[in-house]
Amino acid sequence: MTKLTQWLWGLALLGSAWAALTMGALGLELPFPCREVLWPLPAYLLVSAGCYALGTVGYRVATFHDCEDAARELQSQIVEARADLARRGLRF
């Protein structure tokens, strides 16, 4: 089972539980304050997930480390590739 399938199953399960509670399919008579909170719950969850994602990306960007060894290796590979292409007749 792929990660996408797991997420889709989870969303379907949560969505069907939300729909069953809000539409009264289970026969439960929820108090009015609970129903007031239940209706906008998907929007709250979506906004919360977006805030979490934004915070995670911001934290990862703020704590990003420079990879000087990898940069030197990549630059040497670029020089090597340019020399190989120049030998084959490509001009820069």
Curated annotation (Swiss-Prot):
Protein's UniProt keywords contain Transmembrane: yes
Name this protein carries in UniProt: Dolichol-phosphate mannosyltransferase subunit 3
Record's bilayer topology term: Multi-pass membrane protein
Organism this protein belongs to: Mus musculus (Mouse)
Pathway assignment: Protein modification; protein glycosylation
Lineage, uppermost ranks: Eukaryota, Metazoa, Chordata, Craniata, Vertebrata
Any one GO MF annotation of this record: enzyme activator activity
One GO CC annotation: endoplasmic reticulum membrane
Transmembrane spans: 8-28, 37-57
An individual GO BP term: regulation of protein stability
Keyword hit for Transmembrane: yes
Origin superkingdom: Eukaryota
Family, similarity comment: Belongs to the DPM3 family.
Subunit structure: Component of the dolichol-phosphate mannose (DPM) synthase complex composed of DPM1, DPM2 and DPM3; within the complex, associates with DPM1 via its C-terminal domain and with DPM2 via its N-terminal portion. This interaction stabilizes DPM1 protein.
